[in-house]
A protein has these predicted regions:
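Extracytoplasmic cell-surface/polysaccharide-interacting catalytic and binding patches
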Residues: 1-49, 142-161
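Amphipathic alpha-helical interface surfaces
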Residues: 38-42, 65, 81, 91, ...
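Extended, low-complexity, intrinsically disordered C-terminal regulatory tails
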Residues: 44-70
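A broad, low-specificity signal marking well-ordered, structured residues that form hydrophobic/aromatic
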Residues: 54, 83, 122-123
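Short, flexible, solvent-exposed loop/turn segments with mixed acidic/basic and small polar residues
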Residues: 68-78, 114-116
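Acidic, His- and aromatic-enriched active-site or binding-groove loops in soluble protein domains
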Residues: 73-93
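Catalytic cores and adjacent binding grooves of peptidoglycan-active enzymes
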Residues: 87-161
């Protein structure tokens, strides 16, 4: 099922853990609508701006899958409202800054960020059509969360050094 021009339901629900453990990771109709919103409001604009394919590492997670990976059942992933992703050749911090400045979102987290590796980790972003999006921005270094994104050196819209 095509969710948007560049994103399919299959890539937004794919999980090696679900496959290995025999967990049904099928979203309901409301979850699918939320995934479509994430695609249209976040992923498609990001893909258009960077003009590169996006690799989704985690989209929808059933409650059973959330439990299996140690995530909260209340995670926005369990509602189809969140996605984790990367773009080959684009530092994740650059992607996160672009989303912060150009998209409506509920929560944006630069996950497992290391200052000496701006391409490390991944971007987590959520979108909530049902309510006001909080525009919460966090950076997680693997130990603790900090408000906002780290300061970076920029030249012509690209992270340097």
């Amino acid at each position: 099922m095509q969710l948007s021009k560049h994103f399919k339901l299959e890539e937004m629900t794919k999980s090696m853990t679900a496959t290995r453990k025999g967990i049904d990771n099928s979203p309901g109709a409301g979850d699918i609508k939320n995934l479509e919103n994430v695609c249209y409001e976040i992923l498609e604009p990001v893909r258009a701006h960077f003009d590169k394919p996006i690799t989704v590492t985690s989209g929808y997670r059933s409650e059973a899958l959330c439990e299996a990976i140690g995530s909260k059942k209340t995670s926005q992933h369990a509602k189809g409202q969140a996605v984790d992703f990367e773009i080959a050749g684009v530092p994740n911090i650059q992607t996160a800054y672009w989303i912060q400045n150009n998209c409506d979102f509920d929560q944006l987290i630069l996950e497992f960020y290391k200052k000496d590796d701006p391409a490390g980790g991944w971007v987590h972003v959520s979108y909530n059509e049902q309510g006001a999006n909080r525009k919460q921005v966090l950076t997680y270094d693997g130990k603790s969360y900090e408000n906002g994104l780290p300061d970076m050196k920029w030249k012509d819209g690209v992270v340097v050094g």
